[in-house]
C-alpha cells in the first residue's frame, strides 16, 4: 500500500489539513517519520490514517476497552471523541494505491444534528471505501469496507497497528510479543522465505 494524500477536517486539534505524500520530500520516500513537539498532532495524524482505513483507531479501539464509560454523551471508546470541540462535522479522507495496484479512497465522516432537541449531537459516523479505477465500486457497509481494507492494505486492523503504525509505547509490546504473532506479521511484510 502507498499512501497518496490525507485530508483532515475537524479532528482533535486539527481544523483543516491536507498532507500530500507524493509531493516534495515525501514523494520518493519509502519510509517516513512523523515527528514534532508534544501536542503537535503526530498521534492525530496516525489516528486519521487508521480511521479512514479501518473506521477505528488504536486510541479508541473498542475491543481493547472493557466496561467503557461515557464521556460527553459518547462511549469512551467511540472514535467520535476525536471530533474537534464545537465542530458541526468532521471527516478524514485517505487516497492510496492498494497492494493490488488499484487506486482507492477511504473516508470516515460524521455530522451533527442541525436542529431540534438533539441539535449539535453527533450522528452515527459513515465509513466509505471507493475503488477509483474505471468502473470501480463503492462500499458503504461496514463488512464490505472491512473486506476492501483487508484487500487493499493486506492487514487486518490489529496487524496494521502492530507493524505499520506502532503507536506510543507499542514498539516494546511488539518486541516482547508472542513469537507466532510476530512471525505472522513479518511473513505478511516480507514473505515466508525470509522469516
Annotate the PLM regions.
Residues 185:
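Catalytic phosphate/metal-binding cores of nucleic-acid and nucleotide-processing enzymes, i.e., regions
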Residues 164:
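Conserved beta-strand/loop subsegment of P-loop NTPase cores
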Residues 152-153:
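ATP-hydrolysis module of ASCE/P-loop NTPase motor domains
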Residues 193-195:
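Conserved small/polar residues in nucleotide/adenosyl-binding loops
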Residues 1-143, 147, 157-161:
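Extreme N-terminal "head/tail" segments of very large remodeling/mechanoenzyme assemblies
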